[in-house]
C-alpha cells in the first residue's frame, strides 16, 4: 500500500492546485473582454476629444472635459499595455477594473457638467443619461467584477447619477419628477439586463471550464488506460503479438458500437510467427505433488508464486522469456522475440540457476524437492490461438523434444540435447546423459543427450550455507508447507498485477464541479494518489498535468480570436473547420432560451414605462405598444407553455411547443426575429408622429405648445429618452446570448442605420430642437452657439448609438466565440469519453481473457485488493479434451509453411470451442488453458464457497453441464472435419471434487487450479479412448442420478493413483449434434 494512498477526496481535501487553476481560468477568460472594453473606451475618448476640439468652438472653454479625457485616455492605454502583456496578477486586475470604472464614472460626470462653460444648461444635464447607462452596462458585461461587485458598482453609478440630477433642479415640478422616474427606469432596466447577462455568462463560463477540465481528465485517464492496457497485454503477450490483437479488439468493439455487421471471414485471425535458432527449456519441480497435498490454499498459492516469481527473475537475468506454467512445470524460451546468438548458454545458465535455487530451498527447509530441467535448441512457432484466455505458447517438434528431455532428465541436473551442446561452444563441461535409457521416444529418434556439470558444484560450500541448514534443522518440527511458505516469503516476489495497481494519480482538481461547489466524497475507484514527494516520476506527471491544464485554460482566452491560429476555427471569423460541425452547432438545441424572451419582455416593459411617463399620449402610442404586447405575450405563452399548462395534462401537444422552441432552430430564430424586431421598432415608432411645433412659431408663442401638450418641455428634452429607448432595444438584442452572430449583426446594423436616418434626416424635430426649442440658439452664421449647450445634442445622440452598437457587436462576437468553444469542448469530451469507454472495455476484455470475471473483480474493483488471490472449492467439475490425432496431423514442411497451416487448423478448432462458451447454457463453464491440442475447462468456479452455497443439486448440475459441453465440443469437431476433410476425434476425461484456484506469476499472471481432482481428470483424458468421455466412479454415480447412462470400462492403471474403476458416458449422437446446432 502506498504511504499516502487516498481512496476518497473529501470536502476538506481540495488542494491549492484546484483554486489556482480555477482562478487562472477566471482571470484568463476575462482578458479578452477586458481588452475589448479598454479598446472601446479609448476609441470613445478619442472621438470625444476630436468633437470637443475641432467641432464646437473654443476648446479652452472646455478645459475640464479635455483634461479628464486626456487623463482617461492615457490611463486606458497604460492599462491596455499591462493587460496585453499579462503582467497583472489577480489583485492587479481587480485594481485595474476599479480604475477603469472610476475613470468612466468621472468622465461621465465631467460630461454632465462642463464647469468651464458660461452656464450649466439643463439640457446637457438630462442628456447624459446614455453615458451613465453605458457605465452600468459595461460593469456587468466587460469588467472582471464578481456578481456582487458588479451589482454594487452598477447601483452606485445609477443612484449617484440620479442624486446629481435631483440636486441640480431648482424646482421639482411634475415633469422633473417624471424625468427622474424615467431615468430610474432606464437604470433599473440596465442593471437587470446586465445582471441577467452576467449570470448566464458565468454559468456558461463554469460549464466551459468544467467541460475543459473533464476533457483533460478524460485525456489523462485515456493515457493511463492505454498504459494499463499495454502493461496488461505485455504481462500476458509479447509486444509483437499484443499490438495486432489490441487493434483487432478495438475494431471489433467499434463495429459493434456502429452496428456494422461485416461478413465474417472463413478463418479466424491467426497470431502466430515462426522463429528459428532458439533454445527451449522445460523444468519440473520433483516432489511438489506431495508437498502440494499438505498445503492450505493460501500456502499453495504463496509457494507457487514465490517459486515462479524467483524463476521469472532468473529468466529476466538470463534473457529468457517465460512461456507458460503448467501446474508445477515451468517452461521458457531464449531467442524470442529477438534472435540471440547465445540463446543456448542463456537457457543452460537459467537451468543451473533454477536447480541452485531449489537446492537452497531444500537445504533451508528440509523439504525433499528438486528441479529437473530439459533443454533443446531448434525452431518454434510462437503466438496465440483461440478466442478466449489467451496464453502465449510455442509449438514445434523441437518443443515436444524439449518436453521429453525434461521427463527423461535427472533431478537436480540440466539435461541437454546434442543440438544444444553444439551452440554452447564448450562454455560448460558435460557428461553423458543416457536419456535414451529413460525415454522410448529419445531412443526411437536416436537422440543423444548430455548432463551439464554446474561449475558451482566444484567449489567448496560457503559457511553461510551450513548456518542456514542448521537453522532449517531447528524448524523441522513444523509442517513442510509451513517451513516452505515462511522461507519463500522472505524472497519477496512481486504480487500478481502489482504493476497494474500502482496506477497514476488523478489530480484533486478532477473533483471540480460546475458553479464552484465543493464536491462531496468522490471515490477514485482504481486510481490512487501516490506519494509524489518520493517519486520524481509522480512529480513530472503531476507537472505535466498542470501544464496541460494551464495550456488549455489559456486557450480559452479570446483576446485575438480572429487573428489566432486554431485547428478548429477558420482564420477569419469563428467558423468551424470540421465538415458538418458548423451545421451541427447551428442546429443544436439551446437550453433555457425561454429566459432570453422573458428578459426581452422586461426591456419592452421598461420602454413602455418611459413612453408613458414622458411622451405625448396619443392613440398611436396605445395601438403600437398594444400590438407589441400581444406579440410578446404570444411568444411568452409558447415559450412557457409547459409551465402555464402544467395543470392540464390533456393539452400535452401544446405543452410540447415549449420544448420545440429550444430544439427547433427555425421556430426559435423566427420568434427571436419577431421579438427583437418589435422592440427595435417600438423604441422610435412614435417619434415621427409627435405634434412638433410649426417652423413659424416663435419663442413667445411657447404657451401655445404647452396648451396643446400640457407638458412643460419641448421634444428636444425628450430626445435623450428616445436615445435610451433605442439603446435598451439594442441591449434586448444582446440578451439572446446563444443566437446567431450574423442575425444579431444584421438586426443591429439595420436598426442603427434607421435610427441615424431618423435622428439626422427627419426635418421637423431637428428644426424644433436645434432651431427654436430653446429660444434663440443659433448665431449669426447659422451655427449652433456654444453658449446654448455644451454639447451638440444630435452629435452626442449619434455618438451614443454608435458606441453601444460597436460595443454590442464586439461583445456578441466574444459571446459567440465562447459558445462555440463550449460546444467544441463538449464534443471533444463526448468523443474522448467514448474513446475512454472503448479503452475500458478493451481492458476489461483483456483482463477477462486472462482471468475469470469474478477473479478479475478482485484486482480491478474499488478495494484495490493487493492480497494473494486464492480460493478453495468443495466441488468443481474439471474437463480435459484433447485431439490426439493432431500430433500425427502436425508436420513441418514447405507445403504447410513449416507447420503454420497446421496451427491455423488448430486455431479454428480451439476458436470454435471458445465460441461455445458464449452460449448462456455454458456460462458457468470456465476455460482454464490449452496445452498443445488439449483443451482444459472447469465448471463451478464462479460459485462462492461457503455453507450457503453448498447446494448439492447445483454442484451436481455443473457436472451435467460439463458433459453437455463435452458433447458440444465433439459436435463442433465433427463440423470442422466435414469442412476440412479430416477425421479428428475428441478424447475427453472428466472428474469432480475439491480444487484450489489462484493467480500466480507477477510478470505474466496466470489463473490456474490445482488439486487431486485436476490430476485425475487429466489421467481420465490421457487413458481414455477416442470419441468417448471417461469419468471416475464417483462422477458416474452423479451422472446416473442426472439421467445419464454410463458404461463400465473396468479397472485401469492410473499413474500415481494405482488402479481405478472408470466409466464411459453413453453420449447420444443425435443429442450432441443438436447441442452443436444450438
UniProtKB/Swiss-Prot annotation:
Pfam families: AC_N (PF16214), Adcy_cons_dom (PF06327), Guanylate_cyc (PF00211)
GO biological process: adenylate cyclase-activating G protein-coupled receptor signaling pathway; cAMP biosynthetic process; cellular response to ethanol; cellular response to lithium ion; intracellular signal transduction; negative regulation of cytokine production involved in inflammatory response; regulation of adaptive immune response
Glycosylation sites: 701, 776, 781
Residues engaged in binding ATP: 284-289, 326-328, 372, 929, 1008-1010, 1015-1019, 1055
Record membrane topology: Multi-pass membrane protein
Compositional bias ranges of the Polar residues kind: 503-512
Entry-linked CDD domains: CHD
Membrane-spanning residues: 34-54, 63-83, 95-120, 125-145, 150-170, 176-196, 595-615, 620-640, 669-688, 718-737, 746-773, 792-812
Sequence segments annotated as region (Mediates regulation of adenylate cyclase activity by sphingosine 1-phosphate-induced G alpha 13 pathway): 491-499
Domain of life: Eukaryota
Reactions mediated catalytically: ATP = 3',5'-cyclic AMP + diphosphate
Swiss-Prot/TrEMBL keywords: ATP-binding, cAMP biosynthesis, Glycoprotein, Lyase, Magnesium, Manganese, Membrane, Metal-binding, Nucleotide-binding, Repeat, Transmembrane, Transmembrane helix
E.C. designation(s): 4.6.1.1
Cofactor annotation remark: Binds 2 magnesium ions per subunit. Is also active with manganese (in vitro).
Protein name: Adenylate cyclase type 7
Lineage: Eukaryota, Metazoa, Chordata, Craniata, Vertebrata
Gene: ADCY7
